[in-house]
Design a protein with these regions (language model features):
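Glycine-rich beta-strand-to-loop/alpha-helix junction loops that act as flexible
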Residues: 9, 61-63, 89-91
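ATP/NTP phosphate-donor binding region
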Residues: 1-58, 68, 304, 311
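Short glycine/serine/threonine-rich phosphate/pyrophosphate-binding segments
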Residues: 43, 65-70, 96-97, 126
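Glycine-rich phosphate/pyrophosphate-binding beta-alpha loops
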Residues: 141, 145, 202-218, 286
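ATP/nucleoside-binding phosphotransfer catalytic cores, i.e., glycine-rich phosphate-binding loops
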Residues: 189-190, 218-226, 233-312
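Gly/Ser/Thr-rich active-site loops/lids in small-molecule metabolic enzymes
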Residues: 156-166, 208-238
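Catalytic core of DAGKc-family lipid kinases
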Residues: 6, 16, 37, 75-200
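Short beta-strand/turn micro-motifs composed of small residues
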Residues: 7, 62, 233-235
Length: 312
């Protein structure tokens, strides 16, 4: 079995020594190549090359941004039988994708699950979302949520570490900086339904949307990797209402947090139109501003290697 490990050397949760241990362990099971990324887009290029060269498994070692790039590289030519399986060793700050799948968030435990999955030939085939020409594995957004991602990215370029505290600080600043009086987004569904009162959108391919520490946030709790896309379109931006909803979305009954929002699930697609270009993000990666994005669900897009965590 031929395998490629795509390593983000800037990943925060794994030391060089631990990466060497991972490579040694995988090398005992596969014909292994390990490559470190050098710049933005490099992970996608490496994954695309591996797909076209007939590699069996591509492992993303990094955070959700690295995983997203690898997925886009693997699916450069669309969904087909020759797409390598995806393995993930989480080494970012939040690691939403693996946690939503029920895989270990610890990189050493994740390596063990990956090896066991390869030995036992255990895979799960999951859907992906697509935003225009970009695949995403768990969520994309326009407006406030994307503005927070853009703000955090600006702070990281200044040398700040990506932490939950940083996200909270940027989130508060962006909330009070933004236009909370007039909605700027419009959502169009395939059946002709249109919402014209939306301040920001989260388009989800999985649940949860993200984590605050160990607490998951569930704006679209009925969305899964086995179905279509979920939509959370916020239509009220009052301070009290937002705080109430955010608190409920992390509780035992997240449906209570739907007040003030359009919440839909299992959508084949949708289009979001903005009155003017607004911040846009996919899988926590800040992209250029957009005034229109078309989303669609891509069923059974990719096989993920691993054994889910045992419960009980």
């Amino acid at each position: 079995m031929r395998a490629l490990v795509v390593v983000n050397p800037r990943a925060t949760a794994m030391s060089p020594r631990e990466r060497d241990v991972l490579a040694h362990a995988l090398g005992s099971e596969t014909d292994l190549e390990v490559v470190e990324t050098e710049n933005r887009g490099h992970a996608a290029a490496l994954a695309c090359r591996a797909m076209r060269n007939g590699t069996d498994v591509v492992v993303a070692l990094g955070g959700d941004g690295t995983v997203n790039e690898v997925i886009n590289g693997l699916l450069t030519d669309g969904v087909h039988d020759g797409v390598p399986a995806l393995g993930v060793v989480p080494a970012g700050s939040t690691n939403v994708f693996v946690r939503a799948l029920g895989l270990p968030n610890d990189p050493i435990e994740a390596t063990g699950a990956l090896l066991e999955g390869l030995r036992s030939d255990t895979y799960r085939t999951v859907s992906m979302g697509m935003a225009d020409d970009r695949y995403f594995c768990f969520a994309a957004g326009l407006g406030f949520d994307a503005a927070v991602v853009h703000g955090v990215e600006r702070q990281r370029r200044k040398g700040k570490r990506s932490t939950h505290v940083l996200y909270a600080r940027v989130g508060v600043a962006e909330f009070f900086r933004g236009n909370r009086r007039h909605p700027r987004l419009h959502v169009e569904l395939p059946d002709g339904t249109r919402f014209d009162d939306v301040y920001f959108t989260i388009v989800a391919n999985a649940d949860p949307w993200t984590f605050v520490g160990n607490r998951p946030l569930h704006p679209t709790p009925e969305t899964s990797f086995d179905d279509g896309l979920g939509l959370y379109g916020r239509r009220r931006m009052g301070v009290v209402g937002m705080l109430w909803s955010m608190a409920r979305l992390s509780g035992d009954n997240p449906r209570v947090g739907r007040r003030g929002a359009h919440v839909l699930h299992d959508l084949e697609g949708l289009t979001v139109i903005a009155d003017e270009p607004v911040p846009f993000q996919v899988d926590g990666d800040a992209l250029d501003t957009r005034d229109k994005v078309t989303f669609r669900s891509v069923p059974r897009a990719i096989r993920v290697v691993g054994v889910p965590l045992e419960t009980g």
